[in-house]
């Protein structure tokens, strides 16, 4: 490595990506159900109670779609386009009995998460026996495999954290992807594999910790009434994500679902959304 290359590496290593706090504004919420009008209204009331934190300093317009207003995906998308909500709230398996088999989110939710740019809050199906009460957002987990620079995820997770609640920011590096990368590095004679492993792993985790530190400082400076906990780790994505959700007794999991390069749900988001069924999910 030349001296110029060394200088460039040192300069890049010293450069840190800061978090920029940008308060999430939600002008309207659309609650979508497949229930009759009266039951739909009751469900909407429960959702509004669960999301009471959103009423903080805002005058939000709440609308409800009941089961008699749509019977196809295009009809539902038309209703959403007409309403133009800032947030969609619904549950798994609309107009379907497949909620009894936990292998999908149902075609309506699948399409909503990809065909609209609006964040979707997915709640457990009303007929599914509840493993826990869904009453508030005192404990929110915002989780990804690459937290650095993901201001939107942090801002949305912070917006949904109740006053005096806890926000857990979790960065889980995929250990299998890392090992595949190191396997390739090990085949390059000019690179010390052991040194590369230590340096790369350390850099990945340090960058995430630095970014989260800037999140803590920015949210505190903004005066948000919440406590932030940082988790930076490696592991097998699905099992590690579930462990963090369970250990923290999360009320809400916030994660990214959209990928510019594909039509399907982003990365691990779909299997995780299918697996984590007992708590609401905010899918960005």
Predicted regions and their residues:
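Small/aliphatic-rich secondary-structure junction motif
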Residues: 1-68, 138-198, 220-224, 284
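Short, surface-exposed alpha-helical segments at coil->helix boundaries
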Residues: 40-48, 106, 205-213
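Charged docking surfaces used in two-component/phosphorelay signaling
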Residues: 65-75, 232-238
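Generic hydrophobic alpha-helical segments
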Residues: 72-76, 153, 157, 241
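Gly/Ser-rich helix-loop-strand patches that form or flank binding pockets
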Residues: 77-132, 242-284
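A structural motif corresponding to the C-terminal end of an alpha-helix
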Residues: 116, 212-229
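A short acidic, glycine-rich active-site loop
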Residues: 192-210
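A short, acidic, amphipathic alpha-helical segment used as a generic capping/interface helix at domain edges
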Residues: 211-218, 234-246
């Amino acid at each position: 490595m030349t001296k110029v290359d060394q200088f460039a590496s040192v300069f890049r290593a010293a450069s840190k990506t800061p978090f920029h706090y940008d308060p999430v504004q939600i002008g309207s919420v659309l609650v979508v159900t497949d229930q009759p009008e009266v039951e739909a209204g009751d469900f909407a009331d429960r959702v509004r109670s669960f999301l009471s934190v959103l009423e903080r300093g805002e005058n939000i317009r709440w609308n409800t779609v009941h089961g008699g207003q749509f019977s196809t995906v295009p009809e539902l998308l038309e209703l959403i386009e007409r309403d133009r909500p800032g947030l969609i709230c619904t549950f798994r398996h609309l107009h379907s009995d497949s909620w009894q088999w936990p292998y999908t989110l149902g075609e309506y939710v699948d399409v909503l998460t990809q065909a609209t740019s609006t964040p979707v809050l997915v709640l457990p199906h009303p007929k599914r026996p509840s493993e826990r009460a869904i009453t508030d957002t005192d404990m929110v987990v915002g989780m990804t495999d690459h937290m650095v620079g993901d201001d939107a995820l942090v801002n949305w997770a912070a917006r949904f954290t109740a006053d005096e609640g806890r926000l857990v920011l979790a960065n889980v590096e995929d250990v299998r992807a890392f090992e595949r990368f190191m396997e390739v590095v090990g085949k390059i004679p000019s690179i010390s594999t052991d040194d590369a492993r230590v340096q790369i792993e350390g850099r990945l985790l340090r960058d995430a910790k630095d970014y989260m530190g800037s999140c803590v400082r920015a949210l505190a400076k903004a005066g948000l009434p919440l406590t932030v906990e940082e988790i930076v780790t490696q592991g097998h994505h699905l099992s590690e994500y579930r462990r963090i959700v369970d250990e923290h007794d999360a009320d809400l999991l916030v994660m990214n679902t959209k990928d510019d390069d594909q039509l399907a749900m982003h990365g691990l988001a779909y299997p995780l959304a299918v697996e984590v069924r007992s708590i609401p999910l905010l899918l960005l």
